[in-house]
Amino acid sequence: ASFSARRDGSFAFGTNNKFGNFFAGSLGWIVSDEDFFKVNFIDYLKLRGSFGITGNENVNPQFQRISTLTYAYGTGQNAGYTFGNDPTSIGATIASFKNEDLGWEKQKQLNAGFDLNFSNSKFSLTADYFEKQISGLLFTPSLSLYLGTASAPTANIGTTKTSGFDLNLGYNNATGKNWKVSSNLTFTTAKNEVTETNNGLITGGGYG
Protein backbone atom coordinates (compact mmCIF):
# COMPACT_ATOMS: atom_id res chain seq x y z
CA ALA A 1 0.00 0.00 0.00
CA SER A 2 1.13 3.55 -0.63
CA PHE A 3 -0.29 7.02 -0.01
CA SER A 4 0.81 10.55 -0.87
CA ALA A 5 -0.63 14.03 -0.30
CA ARG A 6 0.34 17.53 -1.33
CA ARG A 7 -0.94 21.10 -1.27
CA ASP A 8 -0.04 23.32 -4.23
CA GLY A 9 -0.50 27.04 -4.82
CA SER A 10 -0.57 28.96 -8.09
CA PHE A 11 -0.52 32.69 -8.83
CA ALA A 12 -2.59 31.96 -11.93
CA PHE A 13 -5.78 31.75 -9.88
CA GLY A 14 -7.85 34.08 -7.72
CA THR A 15 -7.28 34.53 -4.00
CA ASN A 16 -10.04 32.11 -2.98
CA ASN A 17 -8.84 29.39 -5.38
CA LYS A 18 -5.08 29.82 -5.16
CA PHE A 19 -4.42 26.55 -3.29
CA GLY A 20 -5.43 23.00 -4.12
CA ASN A 21 -5.17 19.76 -2.14
CA PHE A 22 -4.17 16.63 -4.06
CA PHE A 23 -3.58 13.05 -2.99
CA ALA A 24 -3.14 9.53 -4.32
CA GLY A 25 -3.29 6.04 -2.85
CA SER A 26 -2.95 2.45 -4.02
CA LEU A 27 -3.52 -1.03 -2.58
CA GLY A 28 -2.41 -4.46 -3.75
CA TRP A 29 -3.11 -7.96 -2.42
CA ILE A 30 -1.41 -11.14 -3.66
CA VAL A 31 -4.23 -13.56 -2.92
CA SER A 32 -2.30 -16.60 -4.18
CA ASP A 33 0.21 -16.21 -1.31
CA GLU A 34 -2.48 -16.72 1.34
CA ASP A 35 -2.77 -20.05 3.15
CA PHE A 36 -6.47 -20.37 2.37
CA PHE A 37 -5.89 -20.17 -1.39
CA LYS A 38 -6.03 -23.76 -2.68
CA VAL A 39 -6.68 -23.39 -6.43
CA ASN A 40 -3.98 -25.57 -7.97
CA PHE A 41 -4.11 -24.41 -11.60
CA ILE A 42 -3.70 -20.73 -10.60
CA ASP A 43 -0.05 -19.84 -10.04
CA TYR A 44 -0.44 -16.16 -9.25
CA LEU A 45 -3.36 -13.85 -8.45
CA LYS A 46 -3.05 -10.23 -7.42
CA LEU A 47 -5.89 -7.77 -6.80
CA ARG A 48 -5.05 -4.07 -6.99
CA GLY A 49 -6.66 -0.65 -6.99
CA SER A 50 -5.68 2.99 -6.95
CA PHE A 51 -7.28 6.41 -6.70
CA GLY A 52 -5.79 9.87 -7.02
CA ILE A 53 -6.48 13.54 -7.62
CA THR A 54 -4.10 15.78 -9.56
CA GLY A 55 -4.30 19.45 -10.53
CA ASN A 56 -3.63 21.42 -13.70
CA GLU A 57 -2.62 25.11 -13.70
CA ASN A 58 -1.64 25.29 -17.37
CA VAL A 59 -3.06 28.67 -18.35
CA ASN A 60 -1.51 31.37 -20.52
CA PRO A 61 -0.88 34.03 -19.41
CA GLN A 62 -0.37 32.99 -15.80
CA PHE A 63 -1.70 36.29 -14.37
CA GLN A 64 -5.37 35.51 -15.06
CA ARG A 65 -6.52 37.21 -11.85
CA ILE A 66 -5.70 40.72 -13.21
CA SER A 67 -6.61 42.62 -16.36
CA THR A 68 -3.73 43.77 -18.56
CA LEU A 69 -3.18 46.76 -20.83
CA THR A 70 -1.11 47.22 -23.96
CA TYR A 71 0.06 50.38 -25.66
CA ALA A 72 -1.25 51.42 -29.08
CA TYR A 73 1.15 53.20 -31.43
CA GLY A 74 1.38 53.86 -35.14
CA THR A 75 -1.19 54.98 -37.70
CA GLY A 76 -0.21 52.19 -40.08
CA GLN A 77 -2.25 49.76 -37.98
CA ASN A 78 -4.84 52.37 -36.97
CA ALA A 79 -3.71 51.76 -33.44
CA GLY A 80 -2.52 55.22 -32.43
CA TYR A 81 -4.40 58.28 -31.26
CA THR A 82 -4.31 61.63 -33.09
CA PHE A 83 -3.93 64.91 -31.23
CA GLY A 84 -3.43 68.01 -33.38
CA ASN A 85 -0.72 67.43 -35.95
CA ASP A 86 0.73 64.34 -34.23
CA PRO A 87 -0.91 61.20 -35.70
CA THR A 88 1.16 58.71 -33.73
CA SER A 89 0.46 59.52 -30.10
CA ILE A 90 0.74 56.52 -27.80
CA GLY A 91 -2.43 55.25 -26.17
CA ALA A 92 -3.48 52.16 -24.22
CA THR A 93 -6.09 49.47 -24.75
CA ILE A 94 -7.22 46.45 -22.75
CA ALA A 95 -5.16 43.40 -23.69
CA SER A 96 -6.89 40.79 -21.54
CA PHE A 97 -9.75 40.57 -19.05
CA LYS A 98 -9.36 39.11 -15.58
CA ASN A 99 -11.20 36.21 -13.96
CA GLU A 100 -10.90 36.33 -10.17
CA ASP A 101 -12.97 33.14 -9.83
CA LEU A 102 -10.61 30.97 -11.92
CA GLY A 103 -9.51 27.82 -10.06
CA TRP A 104 -7.66 24.53 -10.45
CA GLU A 105 -8.63 22.00 -13.08
CA LYS A 106 -8.83 18.72 -11.15
CA GLN A 107 -8.51 15.18 -12.47
CA LYS A 108 -9.80 12.22 -10.45
CA GLN A 109 -8.48 8.83 -11.58
CA LEU A 110 -9.77 5.44 -10.40
CA ASN A 111 -8.22 2.11 -11.41
CA ALA A 112 -9.15 -1.41 -10.30
CA GLY A 113 -7.99 -4.74 -11.67
CA PHE A 114 -6.17 -8.01 -11.24
CA ASP A 115 -3.15 -9.95 -12.55
CA LEU A 116 -3.51 -13.70 -13.09
CA ASN A 117 -1.09 -16.45 -14.16
CA PHE A 118 -2.32 -20.03 -14.58
CA SER A 119 -1.50 -23.43 -16.12
CA ASN A 120 2.12 -23.37 -14.94
CA SER A 121 2.31 -19.70 -15.94
CA LYS A 122 1.78 -20.52 -19.61
CA PHE A 123 -1.20 -18.19 -19.65
CA SER A 124 -1.59 -14.73 -18.14
CA LEU A 125 -4.57 -12.43 -17.87
CA THR A 126 -4.51 -8.78 -16.86
CA ALA A 127 -7.76 -6.87 -16.46
CA ASP A 128 -8.30 -3.22 -15.55
CA TYR A 129 -11.27 -0.92 -15.13
CA PHE A 130 -10.45 2.79 -15.33
CA GLU A 131 -12.47 5.92 -14.72
CA LYS A 132 -11.21 9.48 -15.11
CA GLN A 133 -13.19 12.61 -14.32
CA ILE A 134 -11.90 16.10 -15.10
CA SER A 135 -13.73 18.94 -13.35
CA GLY A 136 -13.21 22.67 -13.68
CA LEU A 137 -11.97 22.35 -17.26
CA LEU A 138 -9.66 25.23 -18.17
CA PHE A 139 -10.87 26.81 -21.39
CA THR A 140 -10.52 30.16 -23.17
CA PRO A 141 -13.78 31.03 -24.97
CA SER A 142 -14.26 33.48 -27.81
CA LEU A 143 -15.31 37.06 -27.09
CA SER A 144 -17.81 39.15 -28.99
CA LEU A 145 -16.19 41.61 -31.40
CA TYR A 146 -18.07 44.37 -29.56
CA LEU A 147 -15.41 44.01 -26.86
CA GLY A 148 -12.57 44.71 -29.28
CA THR A 149 -9.45 42.61 -29.71
CA ALA A 150 -8.80 41.88 -26.04
CA SER A 151 -8.15 38.26 -25.05
CA ALA A 152 -10.95 36.46 -23.25
CA PRO A 153 -10.27 35.31 -19.68
CA THR A 154 -9.72 31.61 -19.14
CA ALA A 155 -12.61 29.98 -17.27
CA ASN A 156 -13.55 26.70 -15.59
CA ILE A 157 -16.24 25.53 -17.98
CA GLY A 158 -17.41 22.06 -16.95
CA THR A 159 -16.72 18.37 -16.41
CA THR A 160 -15.80 15.39 -18.58
CA LYS A 161 -15.74 11.66 -17.82
CA THR A 162 -13.82 8.82 -19.43
CA SER A 163 -14.30 5.17 -18.45
CA GLY A 164 -13.53 1.77 -19.88
CA PHE A 165 -11.79 -1.61 -19.64
CA ASP A 166 -8.38 -2.97 -20.61
CA LEU A 167 -7.89 -6.74 -21.05
CA ASN A 168 -4.67 -8.50 -21.99
CA LEU A 169 -4.40 -12.26 -22.51
CA GLY A 170 -0.91 -13.67 -22.91
CA TYR A 171 0.60 -17.05 -23.80
CA ASN A 172 4.20 -18.03 -22.99
CA ASN A 173 5.64 -21.51 -23.49
CA ALA A 174 9.12 -22.91 -23.94
CA THR A 175 8.94 -25.43 -26.80
CA GLY A 176 12.58 -26.42 -26.61
CA LYS A 177 15.90 -25.56 -25.04
CA ASN A 178 16.38 -22.46 -27.18
CA TRP A 179 12.84 -21.78 -28.33
CA LYS A 180 9.98 -19.90 -26.74
CA VAL A 181 6.53 -19.07 -28.10
CA SER A 182 4.83 -15.89 -26.89
CA SER A 183 1.69 -14.10 -27.99
CA ASN A 184 -0.63 -11.43 -26.59
CA LEU A 185 -4.19 -10.39 -27.28
CA THR A 186 -5.32 -6.95 -26.10
CA PHE A 187 -8.83 -5.54 -25.89
CA THR A 188 -9.68 -1.97 -24.87
CA THR A 189 -12.94 -0.08 -24.64
CA ALA A 190 -13.44 3.55 -23.64
CA LYS A 191 -16.37 5.94 -23.34
CA ASN A 192 -15.91 9.72 -23.32
CA GLU A 193 -18.62 12.19 -22.42
CA VAL A 194 -19.09 15.81 -21.38
CA THR A 195 -21.22 15.61 -18.24
CA GLU A 196 -21.51 19.29 -17.35
CA THR A 197 -20.95 22.76 -18.83
CA ASN A 198 -21.42 26.21 -17.33
CA ASN A 199 -24.15 27.38 -19.67
CA GLY A 200 -24.80 24.49 -22.05
CA LEU A 201 -22.91 26.20 -24.88
CA ILE A 202 -19.17 26.33 -25.52
CA THR A 203 -17.75 28.66 -28.16
CA GLY A 204 -14.22 28.58 -29.51
CA GLY A 205 -11.67 25.83 -30.03
CA GLY A 206 -10.56 22.80 -28.03
CA TYR A 207 -9.36 22.42 -24.48
CA GLY A 208 -6.36 20.72 -22.93
Regions found by a protein language model. Give the residues of each.
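Extracellular/periplasmic, surface-exposed regions of secreted and cell-surface proteins
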Residues: 1-208
